[in-house]
């Protein structure tokens, strides 16, 4: 759950939102439904996302008792860190024939849960770059493992979540892991 009103940086694709809540079942984390429509949720989807344009009227419920290994935690926003496309995404911003994009000092991708920036990919560019839709997808968040919260859903990987520019009720996820 991300309170965007407190974030030090909010990607342009999220400026109309105040709060995002992401739900991913740990047993579906490796093969989630790729695109979801939050205007018409599919009950068979393996992940869900709720968005709120304002915090007005929202309340913080008591944490229910359950057997989950997940631990509710209040996270803290870290300072912004500039990041850059890695070798999987370099072709989006430069001529890869002219630059050694494998050089350590060239590609500084932030490998942590974050809003916006460039995806710190594990295997390839996110699949939505090649999706057979008319949508332009903007990466809005990357979710890494969060050991303090008990979330290790992707082993040594991450999930990348994007939002459609043309149809903002469509959201995409790409999960990569080793």
Each model region followed by its residue ranges:
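Preference for intrinsically disordered or flexible, low-complexity segments
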Residues: 1-178
